[in-house]
Amino acid sequence: TPGKLVTLRDVGHTFTGDTWLFRLLNADLRPDRVYALVGPSGSGKSTLLSILAGWVKPSEGSIQRLNIGKTSWVFQNPIGVARRSVIDHVMLPYLARGLDVPQAEACARELLAQFGLAERASSEYRELSGGEAQRLMLARGVASGADLLLVDEPTAQLDVHTADTVNARLGALSRQGMIVVVATHDHRTRDAATDVIDLEDYQ
């Protein structure tokens, strides 16, 4: 979608005042791209996601969001409601956006199919594997209608085939008008991204 933009200018962050996670980070984040955020553990990937989400103010520099309505964050360790059905997890964001129940259910079923969860629609969340729960939370983030999708280690619990499916879905979401930023250690996710931000370049 034209007009959506997240701009980082000379962004840096420190928790101690003397040791910086990263400094002088400049980037223009746009739809139709998947940005892989890479670097060793402790390099600040999750902190930068928090800055992008607006939860943390950078120690220096500025961040601007243009035409960014909703931000959705998919955490590394998915959190769902144990006894709630899979389809309800995805229907609820659609209902919150004003769809009626039949519309919300139809959209939810389509989305679950895209993430390989169609046969799990009536299962309870607690019955899912780690990989299934991760895909469900991605689907839920999509259902929320987010302009900015932040994803933390989406393939950490997935086998190679499922990870490739998730990486392909992230690419498809970016082409539908989302800005997608993925913190990852997975070289396959990095390779599937259109752009790489390596925090080691900003030490």
Name every feature range the model reports, one short phrase each.
Residues 38-40:
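The feature captures the beta-strand-to-loop junction immediately N-terminal to the Walker
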Residues 53:
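Helix-to-loop junction immediately C-terminal to a conserved catalytic motif
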Residues 84-95:
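Q-loop/switch helix immediately C-terminal to the Walker
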Residues 102-120:
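Conserved ABC ATPase "signature" region
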Residues 124-128, 132:
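Conserved ABC ATPase signature
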Residues 141-142:
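ABC ATPase C-loop
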Residues 149-152:
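Catalytic Walker B motif of ABC-type/P-loop ATPase nucleotide-binding domains
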Residues 160-162:
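Helix N-cap at the start of a conserved alpha-helix in ABC-type nucleotide-binding domains
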